Amino acid sequence: MGYPPPTRRLGDKKRYHYSNNPNRRHPSAVYSKNSFPKSSNNGFVSSPTADNSTNPSVTPSTASVPLPTAAPGSTFGIEAPRPSRYDPSSVSRPSSSSYSSTRKIGSRYNPDVERSSSTTSSTPESMNTSTITHTNTDIGNSRYSRKTMSRYNPQSTSSTNVTHFPSALSNAPPFYVANGSSRRPRSMDDYSPDVTNKLETNNVSSVNNNSPHSYYSRSNKWRSIGTPSRPPFDNHVGNMTTTSNTNSIHQREPFWKANSTTILKSTHSQSSPSLHTKKFHDANKLDKPEASVKVETPSKDETKAISYHDNNFPPRKSVSKPNAPLEPDNIKVGEEDALGKKEVHKSGREIAKEHPTPVKMKEHDELEARAKKVSKINIDGKQDEIWTTAKTVASAVEVSKESQKELTRSVERKESPEIRDYERAYDPKALKTDVTKLTVDNDNKSYEEPLEKVEGCIFPLPKAETRLWELKNQKRNKIISEQKYLLKKAIRNFSEYPFYAQNKLIHQQATGLILTKIISKIKKEEHLKKINLKHDYFDLQKKYEKECEILTKLSENLRKEEIENKRKEHELMEQKRREEGIETEKEKSLRHPSSSSSSRRRNRADFVDDAEMENVLLQIDPNYKHYQAAATIPPLILDPIRKHSYKFCDVNNLVTDKKLWASRILKDASDNFTDHEHSLFLEGYLIHPKKFGKISHYMGGLRSPEECVLHYYRTKKTVNYKQLLIDKNKKRKMSAAAKRRKRKERSNDEEVEVDESKEESTNTIEKEEKSENNAEENVQPVLVQGSEVKGDPLGTPEKVENMIEQRGEEFAGELENAERVNDLKRAHDEVGEESNKSSVIETNNGVQIMDPKGAVQNGYYPEETKELDFSLENALQRKKHKSAPEHKTSYWSVRESQLFPELLKEFGSQWSLISEKLGTKSTTMVRNYYQRNAARNGWKLLVDETDLKRDGTSSESVQQSQILIQPERPNINAYSNIPPQQRPALGYFVGQPTHGHNTSISSIDGSIRPFGPDFHRDTFSKISAPLTTLPPPRLPSIQFPRSEMAEPTVTDLRNRPLDHIDTLADAASSVTNNQNFSNERNAIDIGRKSTTISNLLNNSDRSMKSSFQSASRHEAQLEDTPSMNNIVVQEIKPNITTPRSSSISALLNPVNGNGQSNPDGRPLLPFQHAISQGTPTFPLPAPRTSPISRAPPKFNFSNDPLAALAAVASAPDAMSSFLSKKENNN
């Protein structure tokens, strides 16, 4: 409650009024000494005196009009403009004296005069329910009297009127004052809807703007230009009791009726009237008699029960006639009064809930029509008899209370259960759920009818997809049924909201400046924070750069030291190599340019496309790795509002229905997996135990991982999953053990066969020795390509043919079964191992055949025997390695990398031995590791040196050692006494030997062809021998041992190596026809795996050592048995990958001092001269008694197979030139 504003301002002229009431026409009761109360109405309603309160006959001249109230504490000076008192056209022109019959208590200089005790506080509701009547008293025709028509009292004496006072501003609502008085509020307190008005209960005098204490009567015209406009008080104007106007002079049409545009009032109407372009006002234009009546007010409880008008909606006006007497003809008016009062007591919110916004204009039109209808009632003759009893007021209050209760029940908001469920409950008793009372709703409902046609079969769907389909398939009516705030007419623009213009104006005039200051302060702090962070960052960056410079310098120094140490170490190694006389790879490449050519065999795994290489390099890039692994750091939150004012309400796991979640106890126990799904689950579980995500993926997404988990635990007791896993592992172990057992049994069977073959081979050798004693002594040596002894002896060609066919079938079968081939290889290796245990094999003629060890001791080491020895050792090592397998890994440790060069020095290119020494690397891993790092580390030199020391293998042959080549076979002289019928065919250019020991091979008839009919006939005896029919050509890639020396087959002829170049020369010289020689030579399959070509072109110097006798120990025995010198027998040894020497250089680059000669001492004939000779013979070169010094070859075609093929193609012309050079060198 605020105090009234000062009664006048500085510069205002002091108004004159009668303080002591000298005029007898004015009742003395009006000028009592009671002061203005300290209320929000600022004394606008005067309190009656004690006399007036008790004397009903005293009637004031005017009725007091209740005025609107304002909020306390508001200022008065700038709130509303005041019209000038000197403006004659102003209807609210002030006067210098009061023209009312009664005057308010107190004066404008003493407004705080004590009020009478009969004053009670009143609200707008109490004003509506209370009836205020006045008695018309004749007080004379003074200009100050209301009865007199004057400039101070423009109303006539015979009628009452309602004066319409428009607002000074065009958009301000008008107000109405009874009896033509320009009633205007004194301060902002009059506008507040929150402050109640005081209502006089007894005889009340009227107050208008022309009263002495009225502030607007003293207002100046310049105040109308004030910036803040007067707030509306139309809500209270409707509560004023007015009279109908019969004088048309000052009557104006209401503003709400004249203006056709309507805008809803906002909640802030009391602060800014300019926000509204239209106000709705109601005025019950009823005649107000001036007869004095007795007024009774309701009790305090009744007053409190009356609802309060809301400021947001127009009030409902009372259309009753409170001054009408209770007569039969006025009952209708009383009923309308009761209805009007009932409506008045409804609050604004209740009215808004009853009637939506679009209906408000209709309500106002109805109110206006009702007011006009009531005003037409003729009550002129009854004005003096109008009176009101307490019964009328009490009944009206009672009706209003009942209507308020009904409205409260009707508009009471019913809270949804969802809202109540969100309240947190902490009582354990309330949280406890009775499991026995749980019920499960049957969710087995069918799918709804699709709104759109479904193409194809999409059902059944998983749970989430099904729910999504249901939501999309809902009709619009069902979707919007629960949308409480959905508007009937959609709002297209934000400015269409009723609060838009109001909030915009408030922001511009009030809140905008405050917000601007606050936001600018926040931005300023944020900017300062950023600057400080930048300074900190720059300081840290400088510090980091300094540390990086220090570390860079340190790493550079360490790098320099490391490079220097490596350079010194490299120099020491180079110096050591020079001292030892080892050539470096670079020096050797300069000496032998042909050796620098790369191998034609390429590893395709080393070649990748550019995109893949870029991807690999990108993955290795540390910057890329860092970028991929780095976390995305969000920016700092510098805004304090975002940093501190943001709040988050976590409703995760909020239980809104405790029975709903508890019902899982009944639902989860049921398993709905089908048999097919269960079988898929079992298969997936056995593959991925307890990895339910992978199991769900294995099932094809039929079930989610969560459902798989539930299914596992539901069926855990019925299905023993652990036992299923154990059984599966047992089966896997049993299958692996069965495979190992079968492999072991196969190897045992092969060992038994090997034992039998050893006994048979011993018997075969004894038979051969016996047959040699019965043979003729003068038998020329022949080349025999024998085989290792195995199986039954073959004495006839039929048996040989049968054996060839059997072996051919075995070859075809073994090519399809690689495992069987490996087993046979192991068996063959065991045969070789057992056969090499005997150091000397004695024949009947006293000839001793030494094993490789004995040959080494005597200074003679046959090449093929030595290779056989190494191959047997390799096979044994492989067998041991397979029997005790170790874990193989492609990772090379530091120890293995350091040990590898030492193993290369020890074993050279024998990868299997190096693999066995390392233990964790296979033969392929060792070979690949050598190929990758040989050029960089200079290992090729080590391998060449080791191979040369071991068997003279050149470095170039290491690269081709991986190609499967048929190895050379040792020449064994054991067939001097074999009968001609039992001698097999020996080669392409060979006939049967018939001459003596020293007879040259040229004496043999050259017409004998290897495939001719006389190929197997003896020249002297002409004894017929059954011809050997050749089987169809086959393509075996592996040679197997044979028990007897059989006749050569196509395979033997194709793969037979020709060991001696001088033998080839003699054979070529014995050919009479060059065309015949070419045809025989073309019969060789050059396209094979270079077996014959290698022997033809790659005959090294060590091929000259083809005898099993040494010059120091067995020269005498050879003289006693001359027939044994020229018989050469070649044995087939196991097919191993031991590197062979390349003899292209020996063919094309003869070594000085290494001439060859026939056994009779004459040199070899040139190639052209040998063509004119007779039958070709094949004498054996004499065994060497001293080691041969080897010089590096001048030309080497071992790394260039195309050059080798070209050399073979030009053999007739090229060989003679090379052999002539060789002869000249001798």
UniProtKB/Swiss-Prot annotation:
Domain HTH myb-type: 884-938
Annotated segments matching region Disordered: 1-219, 264-331, 569-605, 732-796, 1172-1194
Chief place of localization: nucleus
Ranges annotated as biased composition (Low complexity): 81-103, 116-131, 202-211
Residue positions where Phosphoserine is found in the record: 187, 395, 1037
InterPro entries: Homeodomain-like_sf, Myb_dom, N-CoR_corepressor, SANT/Myb, SANT_dom
Residues annotated to bind DNA: 911-934
Coiled-coil positions: 539-591
Compositional bias ranges of the Polar residues kind: 31-64, 132-143, 150-170, 264-275
Pfam families linked to this entry: Myb_DNA-binding (PF00249)
Gene Ontology CC entries for this record: chromatin; cytosol; histone deacetylase complex; nucleus; Rpd3L-Expanded complex; Set3 complex
CDD domains, sorted: SANT
Domain SANT: residue ranges: 668-720
Listed Acidic residues bias regions: 748-758
Statement: the UniProt record of this protein carries the keyword Nuclease: no
PTM-bearing positions, type Phosphothreonine: 796
Biased composition, class Basic residues, residue ranges: 11-27, 732-745
Quaternary data: Identified in a Set3C complex with SET3, HST1, HOS2, SIF2, CPR1 and HOS4.
Name this protein carries in UniProt: Probable DNA-binding protein SNT1
Source organism of this protein record: Saccharomyces cerevisiae (strain ATCC 204508 / S288c) (Baker's yeast)
Upper taxonomic lineage: Eukaryota, Fungi, Dikarya, Ascomycota, Saccharomycotina
Gene encoding the protein: SNT1
